[in-house]
Amino acid sequence: SSMESSLYTGDHLFVSKLAYGPKMPQTPLTIPFTHNVIGRKESYSTLIQSDYKRLKGFGEVETGDYVVFGFPHGDTVFVNDPAADYYTIIRTYGRDYAHKLYGPVKVRPSDKKDHYVKRCVAVAGDTLEIIDGRVYIDSEPQEVWPGVQNSYTVVTNGQRINPVNLDKIGLNLSELWYDQKLPGYPALPLTAEMLEKVKSLPNVVSVTENIDRWPADYPDSEKTIFPFSPDFKWTRDNFGPLWIPEKGAEVELTLENLPLYERIITSYEGNELSVRDGKIFINSEEAQSYTFAQDYYFMMGDNR
């Protein structure tokens, strides 16, 4: 999982809805104690819908917090595979082939998106940048929290590392792959503490961090990495700089930076946007700037 070593698949989480303020139901006609499905059918009706409203909480989202939130792309899902990222699949395969491959589509209300849990690494107004796998906020390196792990290539002397030692270090043995040709492990997820322990093992020859640089180490990077545009040479390990929008802030809109803000303006803030003759129109009026109506946050898993 993307939070492995901090949180594990199967863990039971207790979530306070009062911390940041409880969100009022937007889809009140829901079967009690269900979220969006019961069996393979929706557990709610959209007959009654209300606007987004959140009551005041005890505090604000802060950098480093674990946050449970609705997956942003979860407003549209494939009925037969709701865990698949609809928008990434559409970009990768094309709409017609994707629908043929995955089947019918369901549009979900905002409060019925699947829940994700990640760590907040940037809040509204921050400028986020990832350089060789390290997070920087406003040009300053961010604290590396316990539990954050990166991927490493571990070369051995031709012998596998004793599984007992790997288990003691805290690695999930079922997820490890040993490549005889290397010889070694091409992708070991390690925290800083685990890294030092692996380096000290007698049959380890070298340990190198896996860094994804442009051109990306895997195909179709612009289809899987925000803002999903070939004009942005970003990868998961070298990303940004990206300014995180905050309520009331105004940004100049250009055709060059539009991919960064288009989905916020349309999907999250409910505006119509189009581009005609090289000009940007919002709600049928030409726009050279935009003022954000909400604060935004950047979440990231600890398993990086």
Task: Show where each model-derived region lies.
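Soluble "head" domains of membrane/secretory-pathway proteins
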Residues: 9-304
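Aromatic-capped interface at the extracytoplasmic side
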Residues: 1-3
